[in-house]
From Swiss-Prot:
This is Small ribosomal subunit protein bS16. Residues 143-156 have a biased composition (Low complexity). SUPFAM superfamilies: Ribosomal protein S16 (SSF54565). It comes from Rhodococcus erythropolis (strain PR4 / NBRC 100887). Keywords: Ribonucleoprotein, Ribosomal protein. One of its GO terms (molecular function) is structural constituent of ribosome. GO terms for cellular component: cytoplasm; small ribosomal subunit. GO terms for biological process: translation. Pfam families: Ribosomal_S16. The keyword Ribonucleoprotein applies. The keyword Ribonucleoprotein applies. InterPro entries: Ribosomal_bS16, Ribosomal_bS16_CS, Ribosomal_bS16_dom_sf. Residues 114-156 are annotated as: Disordered.
Amino acid sequence: MAVKIKLTRLGKIRNAQYRVVIADSRTRRDGRAIETIGKYHPKEEPSLIDIDSERAQYWLSVGAQPTEPVEALLKITGDWQKFKGLPGTEGTLRVKEAKPTKLELFQAALAQAENEPVAEAITPKKKKAAKADEAKAEDTAADAEAPAADAEAADK
């Protein structure tokens, strides 16, 4: 029985995700697999490539033939070079940066809040309101002067 290492497709339309499987060469693409040894998500940035190196080495040693896409993945992870005895067994796999945990984000926010100066709870009045207050003050002053002028005129 000829055994191949190939990809089976999973996922939604336009969001392909693959599993790296060991299967009989005569089975269809998504057919029955002997063993699943990894996964490949090409749409993520950087692409997620997770292959069980020990199982891949075993299946390559017993004669399983990788398809062209799987061979390219094995070269990226360094498993193909290890099997062939070539230099560069560390591979060229890029790893996604780890996201900070919620606890780390919370601690950072607390530290930032402690370092900031305390702000006033009351916001200053807008400039338009200040101009309106000045206009009202002038009107009240003018109104106060008018009765005083009337009183002086009446006294004379």
